[in-house]
Amino acid sequence: MTDKKYIIALDQGTTSSRAVLLDHNANVVEIAQREFTQIYPRAGWVEHNPMEIWATQSSTLNEVVAKAGITSDEIAAIGITNQRETTIVWEKSTGTPVYNAIVWQCRRTADITDKLKADGHEEYIRNTTGLVVDPYFSGTKVKWILDNVEGAREKAERGELLFGTVDTWLVWKLTQGRVHVTDYTNASRTMLFNIHTKQWDDKMLEILNIPRSMLPEVRNSSEIYGQTNIGGKGGVRIPVAGIAGDQQAALYGHLCVHAGQAKNTYGTGCFMLLHTGNKAITSKNGLLTTIACNAKGEPEYALEGSVFIAGASIQWLRDELKIVHDSFDSEYFAQKVTDSNGVYVVPAFTGLGAPYWDPYARGAIFGLSRGANRNHIVRATLESIAYQTRDVLEAMQSDSGERLQYLRVDGGATNNNFLMQFQADILDVNVERPVVKEVTALGAAYLAGLATGFWKDLDELRDKARVERTFSPDSDNEKRERRYKGWKKAVKRSLEWAKEDEE
């Protein structure tokens, strides 16, 4: 226990930087948020300005302290959570970035990943890093910068450049260039890290021609990395003490720290993580093997899967079909009918991800009869989010042999009670929605608070991780399996839809 009263979580996201101030009971006291510029130099390319990331993030830090009317000596520690994979390379001596940050969504390195596949590296990468070969991850982005920015490779080979994901950049800036670190969760997203030995992988560095001197030191997610001054020179020195990538921070914020515990974040898509304890499981279903935290913030493992289209399908009902005026209306229409009247919506607008991995699948509505109306289509669209979640969780359970204990949930769509109840019904497990919705920030705050003694241990936090509502499954097993079988049939018919057109 400490006389300090607050923890600050810096939540550096893809579209905005936020600072969240939490008290000793893990309540959100104040939030400051600033959006920053999305840069699209060409189709499929996405960049951020690293100096703007830092400017927005540091200003929210000062702003949240000012808004709450507190002094900086009341702050115990700062924790950081961040958009993962986004890649920054800067000069060691000046701290000046040599290029914009290349964002996780950016597809510019597709030709590099194609070559990795053609050269037969796919299996090695999967077995060593836990990842699939895709432009999403940091390694090929670093290579692109070294190959395409004038003078960058020569400087890197002389030891003059540093690489970091966004967490590393923020810690570097917060500590005035004294500390160059990352944590295990972020390192596991680079495609340069051996998740079994927990070391940077020499063979991957050789394949991508990246000098080892650029890489940060990898540390636990809960420890003191350095100090920062709030309010410039002569200000109070505050420990920077927790780091985790956004999805792993959310897993920790839900207190999912043991094998068999899982969370799903419902946003535009869904991000699911299932904790697998000290076992790194190689998926047979195209899921990622990634590093997550145990109770002490030390590295253990998780399986990660994502659904491409979740909340985006409700936006489609609103913006394209115009059958709901507002996303919130979807619950009202869905509950006007007792079932979907045999209608299934497969929202494969951009293909299907895990466990199907079919880029040629396309969206479809099946089972329409003359009696099908707006309510049935809205309901079937919401149901598709729950069905896709079951698809991924079944793949996770078959890979891991872990039986899901319960599902913790966060993200915008969790406010939809119909969807949460249907999710519980179709999974046959309890779905738990927390009181504090800022779960990602909570995870970073917990990691920082435990490192500095603000909280004693995770048991102290369990009382604070309050569940706002538990959705318990309907016990009708026959109905559950009949509905899911219908979904599988609908998916099967939407697969490879666009393929014939290209032949």
UniProtKB/Swiss-Prot annotation:
This is Glycerol kinase. GO terms for cellular component: cytosol. Keywords: ATP-binding, Glycerol metabolism, Kinase, Nucleotide-binding, Transferase. Residues 468-489 are annotated as: Disordered. It comes from Haemophilus influenzae (strain ATCC 51907 / DSM 11121 / KW20 / Rd). Pfam families: FGGY_C, FGGY_N. HAMAP family: Glycerol_kin. Signal peptide: none annotated.
